[in-house]
């Protein structure tokens, strides 16, 4: 019996038999010792008692084995679970998606909790709350009724499904429709704690908290008056209606479209505008004379609007004039750019043809018998049929000079000479005849102009010279002043002294010698005069006594002078 039960147990747990074999053997040894003791004690009672005890012992052994197997199974399962837990804790989770999913589950759970909490709160009008907007911190505000809101704010209520609360912000009193997710209750304790904490805060946020503290309920809230609603409605109407500037701009735009012909648009004729030929320059008349367009303006603001129309219309007209000028300048600039580009492209193509013809026929080392005349014929045909050629292109590229040289070229093969020269002659005599005549006339005019200019310059020079000569003859030379004369004399004296030192006696010395000679001659003449007087006196004395003439005293106080001595 024991062997059968053991085999059944082994069949039930074949994988775990090896692990618990040591425990089973130890228990079998203990049971065997116990059985041997029982056999010894009961040997005296007889063989039957021994058999009974053995059977009982075998049954107990089987029960013990089953209990041990169960306990070993439980221990093994516990150890396996512990090993699994240690493996999971030791190995780090490399899957980032699992971590994100766990975090998202946590955040969703928190959000659900918050939404549940916010849904539980019943936000009533007059309740102070903190409202969250994107880009701003939680801002103090108050839940209000729709009657406290302006018409514009009431119209801005969201149409999607859900509950939305009208909120007014402190201190600017701006309205917003928001859901319960963006609201949290604001108590007076939270306000005082915020204001007492020394955290960095903005002035507007502090002002908002102070205003929320001073307005505990809806009755103490001062809502914007109805005038602001009227002004908002008027501003909406003004924004929806076109201004005079926009009307003028639309009119000018329609006129431009019809002028260009890109879009066909019917324009009604207004007979009242016949007296205004320049509508853009007088925008005020445009606004006043158009009865079809009526501006809806409140009576309070009609006077101000009428006063402000004239400067706005003037600005509009000036802006339109500037725009027209800019467009005209831009169109002119675009036309100039296009003309420059076309001229440049034509110039490059003519220079290419000139280079090909010159290199193939006019190069000094070129053998004319080995030239590919098919290419030459192709180049000449392109030149003959060239579109857009004019005088500036011919003058700048000098293509006509190359064609003339090819036309007068000698040494061309007889097979190709007639063909080449016929094309060149056709270009010079027929196709470019008028252009070449114009160039020659321009050259003649330039030469004539240069000659006339030279002649006029020569005549001007001659007239200037003649006028200078006449002026020198007619106008006397001015005499230099006295000071200048004295300076000149001193300079001359100094120069004479220098010459005397270097070259011997000068003219002054000669003059002094002449002066001394004159003095001597004068003395001689005076002596001769005295002798003649003495002789005359002697002659006068022959009438009476012989004596010298008696010179009486001079009349009228004239002193007598002794001629011999020269004294009085």
Swiss-Prot record:
<feature type="region of interest" description="Disordered">
    <location>
        <begin position="213"/>
        <end position="340"/>
    </location>
</feature>
<feature type="compositionally biased region" description="Acidic residues">
    <location>
        <begin position="325"/>
        <end position="336"/>
    </location>
</feature>
<feature type="compositionally biased region" description="Basic and acidic residues">
    <location>
        <begin position="489"/>
        <end position="500"/>
    </location>
</feature>
<feature type="compositionally biased region" description="Acidic residues">
    <location>
        <begin position="229"/>
        <end position="249"/>
    </location>
</feature>
<feature type="compositionally biased region" description="Polar residues">
    <location>
        <begin position="29"/>
        <end position="46"/>
    </location>
</feature>
<feature type="compositionally biased region" description="Low complexity">
    <location>
        <begin position="214"/>
        <end position="228"/>
    </location>
</feature>
<dbReference type="GO" id="GO:0005634">
    <property type="term" value="C:nucleus"/>
</dbReference>
<dbReference type="InterPro" id="IPR000313">
    <property type="entry name" value="PWWP_dom"/>
</dbReference>
<dbReference type="Pfam" id="PF00855">
    <property type="entry name" value="PWWP"/>
</dbReference>
<dbReference type="InterPro" id="IPR035503">
    <property type="entry name" value="IOC4-like_PWWP"/>
</dbReference>
<feature type="compositionally biased region" description="Basic and acidic residues">
    <location>
        <begin position="100"/>
        <end position="122"/>
    </location>
</feature>
<dbReference type="GO" id="GO:0035064">
    <property type="term" value="F:methylated histone binding"/>
</dbReference>
<feature type="compositionally biased region" description="Polar residues">
    <location>
        <begin position="281"/>
        <end position="292"/>
    </location>
</feature>
<feature type="compositionally biased region" description="Basic and acidic residues">
    <location>
        <begin position="514"/>
        <end position="541"/>
    </location>
</feature>
<feature type="region of interest" description="Disordered">
    <location>
        <begin position="1"/>
        <end position="126"/>
    </location>
</feature>
<dbReference type="GO" id="GO:0033100">
    <property type="term" value="C:NuA3 histone acetyltransferase complex"/>
</dbReference>
<protein>
    <recommendedName>
        <fullName>PWWP domain-containing protein2</fullName>
    </recommendedName>
</protein>
<feature type="compositionally biased region" description="Basic and acidic residues">
    <location>
        <begin position="48"/>
        <end position="88"/>
    </location>
</feature>
<feature type="compositionally biased region" description="Basic and acidic residues">
    <location>
        <begin position="1"/>
        <end position="19"/>
    </location>
</feature>
<feature type="domain" description="PWWP">
    <location>
        <begin position="125"/>
        <end position="189"/>
    </location>
</feature>
<feature type="region of interest" description="Disordered">
    <location>
        <begin position="465"/>
        <end position="568"/>
    </location>
</feature>
<dbReference type="GO" id="GO:0006338">
    <property type="term" value="P:chromatin remodeling"/>
</dbReference>
<feature type="compositionally biased region" description="Basic residues">
    <location>
        <begin position="255"/>
        <end position="266"/>
    </location>
</feature>
């Amino acid at each position: 019996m024991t062997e059968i039960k053991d085999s059944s147990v082994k069949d039930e747990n074949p994988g775990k038999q090896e692990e618990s074999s040591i425990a089973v053997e130890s228990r079998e040894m203990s049971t065997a010792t116990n059985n041997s003791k029982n056999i010894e004690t009961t040997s005296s009672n007889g063989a039957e008692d021994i058999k009974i005890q053995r059977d009982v012992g075998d049954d107990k052994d089987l029960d013990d084995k089953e209990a041990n197997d169960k306990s070993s199974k439980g221990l093994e399962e516990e150890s396996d679970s512990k090993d699994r837990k240690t493996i999971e804790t030791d190995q780090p989770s490399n899957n980032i998606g699992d971590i994100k999913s766990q975090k998202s589950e946590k955040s969703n759970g928190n959000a659900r909790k918050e939404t549940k909490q916010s849904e539980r709160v019943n936000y009533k009008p007059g309740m102070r709350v903190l409202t969250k907007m994107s880009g701003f911190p939680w801002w103090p505000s108050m839940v209000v009724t729709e009657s406290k809101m302006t018409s514009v704010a009431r119209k801005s209520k969201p149409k999607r499904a859900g509950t939305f609360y009208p909120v007014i912000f402190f201190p600017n009193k701006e309205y917003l429709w928001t859901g319960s997710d963006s609201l949290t209750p604001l108590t007076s304790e939270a306000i005082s704690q915020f204001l007492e904490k020394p955290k960095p805060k903005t002035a507007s946020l502090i002002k908002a908290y102070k205003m929320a503290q001073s307005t505990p309920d809806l009755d103490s809230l001062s809502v914007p008056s109805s005038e602001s609603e009227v002004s908002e409605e008027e501003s909406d109407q003004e924004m929806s209606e076109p201004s005079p500037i926009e009307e003028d701009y639309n009119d000018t735009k329609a006129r431009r479209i019809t002028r260009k012909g890109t879009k066909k648009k019917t324009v009604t004729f207004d007979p009242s505008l016949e007296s205004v030929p320049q509508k853009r320059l007088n925008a005020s008349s445009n606004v006043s004379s158009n009865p079809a367009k009526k501006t809806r303006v409140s009576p309070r603001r009609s006077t101000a609007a009428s006063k402000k129309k004239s400067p706005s219309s003037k600005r509009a007209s000036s802006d339109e004039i500037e725009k027209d000028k800019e467009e005209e300048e831009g169109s002119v600039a675009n036309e100039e750019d296009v003309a420059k580009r076309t001229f440049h492209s034509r110039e490059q193509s003519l220079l290419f043809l000139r280079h090909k013809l010159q290199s193939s026929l006019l190069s000094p080392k070129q053998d004319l018998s080995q030239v590919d005349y098919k290419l030459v014929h192709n180049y000449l045909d392109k030149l003959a049929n060239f579109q857009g050629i004019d005088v500036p292109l011919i003058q700048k590229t000098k293509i006509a000079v190359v064609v003339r040289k090819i036309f007068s070229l000698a040494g061309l093969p007889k097979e190709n000479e007639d063909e080449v020269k016929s094309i060149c002659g056709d270009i010079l005599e027929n196709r470019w005849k008028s252009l070449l005549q114009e160039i020659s006339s321009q050259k003649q005019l330039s030469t004539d102009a240069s000659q006339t200019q030279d002649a006029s310059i020569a005549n001007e020079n001659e007239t200037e010279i003649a006028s200078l000569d006449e002026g020198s003859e007619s106008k006397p030379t001015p005499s230099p002043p006295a000071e200048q004369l004295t300076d000149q004399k001193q300079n001359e004296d100094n120069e004479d002294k220098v010459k005397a030192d270097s070259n011997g006696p000068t003219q002054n010395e000669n003059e002094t010698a002449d002066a001394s000679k004159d003095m001597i001659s004068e003395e001689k003449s005076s002596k001769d005069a005295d002798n003649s007087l003495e002789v005359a006196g002697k002659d006068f004395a022959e009438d009476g006594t012989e004596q010298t003439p008696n010179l009486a005293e001079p009349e009228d106080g004239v002193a007598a002078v002794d001629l011999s001595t020269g004294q009085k």
